[in-house]
Amino acid sequence: ANRILENQATVDGLTGCLNRRGMENRLDEVQHGFGRGGVSERITLVLFDIDFFKQYNDTYGHLAGDDCLKTVASIPRSMAQNSKDFVARYGGEEFVVVLVDTSLKDALVFAERMRTRIEQLGLPHTGSRISQVVTISVGVASAGNCDNDATNLIKCADEALYQAKGAGRNRVAYMSDQGRVVTL
């Protein structure tokens, strides 16, 4: 019974991903698993959201929106290689992928593959101003390039995501080791 309650408290019922609370718990576990209380330099956070998702819901309805969220979430879940990696629904149409023991370079390859695979799903999206299919914008940050805690890692990834959106969406941006956001 306790396991069921814990699962309900930490897993998003729609997508099967961790929810925000579950993500914070797992990130804390990973963080403390490396000792010293700081985030490992080998943790990379990939933050993404679905471009023009509100318009998607307005165009196709909330049931279709739910199906879109489930389908999009399944892509990074199927791509995660390391048993310590995890995917969480951060809120609304925003998701986080935490890649453990992954360099920034490898995380960027992961992010671009994920972006491409989601676009190639071909989910129709006539409400999008950039494409006729569902796309995502992605921000990537590595613990080695941000202040050494989970809150700052998320903040760095969010800055990169904001830059990806500002550069036209449907792209990946990342926080460089010089503290600048670079768009691919």
Question: Model segments located where?
Answer:
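Short regulatory alpha-helical coupling segments
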Residues: 4-7, 20-42, 73-82, 100
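Cell-envelope/extracellular polymer assembly enzymes that use nucleotide-activated donors
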Residues: 44, 137
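Alpha-helical scaffold within the catalytic cores of cyclic-nucleotide enzymes
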Residues: 73-77, 106-125, 158
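Catalytic-core segments of nucleotide cyclases and related cyclic-nucleotide turnover enzymes
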Residues: 100, 104-112, 128-129, 141-184
